[in-house]
Amino acid sequence: MDDLRTSREYASIGELLVTTARTRPSRPAAARVAVSDGYRVTAARVDTWLDGGQITSASVSFSRDNTAAPLSLMSSDFEVQGRAWPFLLSADKVRRLVASGYTMVITGPEIWDGTLRRSALEVTRAMAASLNTMVFLTPPGTSGFHRHRDRDDFVVVVQTEGSKRWRLYDAPPDGWTEDDDTRPAPAAQSAEVVLDVGDTLVIPRGWGHAASAETGGVSTHLSFGVNHVSPAHLLRTAIIGALRRMKESATLEDTEAAYRALVAEFREGAADDLVLEYVSAPFRTGDLRLGDL
């Protein structure tokens, strides 16, 4: 099997992400990285978020052996005017799910964690690429997901607590797209590596992989999805957003005028600056998030 470990040591997670975005590696590789306190996400820190009511059902999911937990197993029984609010989490239910072997997946912790948000803002501006941050908390000796491929240009894994065993398979087959859910074959395994705290693994788009926590304790890792954004994609996103916001009574002439105005504005602006504004928007307090564009 391939040896994924390199002698590279990154001084910070920011350096790791920026280097990945700029060099665009073509094969998986493992290295070491210094994890600052701001990025040191552990089960205890997740408990703090949970007890503070900062995590909602919109930003978390649970999976055990590739089977998702239903909303009823995590949502609070809290009622307002006689109606349940399912987006509120029950801390007790969440802990029972994890204790029973479910992996907890948190998306976008920058929404409530100011330290992570400030770091993400700095990193996205430096690498000129979008960033999707997730936290995976996996009970010892368990696996949340089966073999699969991710659509991000790069997935950058950083182990922050415990240990996790990663199995790498093959590169995406010719013609692979994000809509192809065909799983890598077991015989296609090409490498295996155990990540301890401070280890990192970079997985290029579509490369087959699977992971499971080691038996010694809970595993927590950060997963950063890094995606390059072209000026053309930015223009398409802006056009779609503008068309969606138009009134149903808008005429064909109104639609054509809105389209031409956007194209003219885009051509007059500096494309690189527009991309930087786009990728950093989710982490600037008070600005529109990407979904609002």
Regions found by a protein language model. Give the residues of each.
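An N-terminal JmjN-like helical accessory module and its immediate linker preceding a catalytic domain
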Residues: 1-62, 66-69
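Short, conserved secondary-structure segments in the cores of folded domains
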Residues: 145, 154-155, 191
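Fe(II)/2-oxoglutarate
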Residues: 1-15, 22-27, 182-194, 210-293
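Hydrophobic alpha-helical hairpins/lids featuring a short glycine-rich hinge
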Residues: 78-137
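Conserved metal-binding segment of the jelly-roll/cupin
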Residues: 160, 193-212
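A short beta-strand-loop-beta hairpin characteristic of the jelly-roll/cupin
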Residues: 163-197
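Short, conserved beta-strand element in jelly-roll/cupin
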Residues: 136-140, 151-172
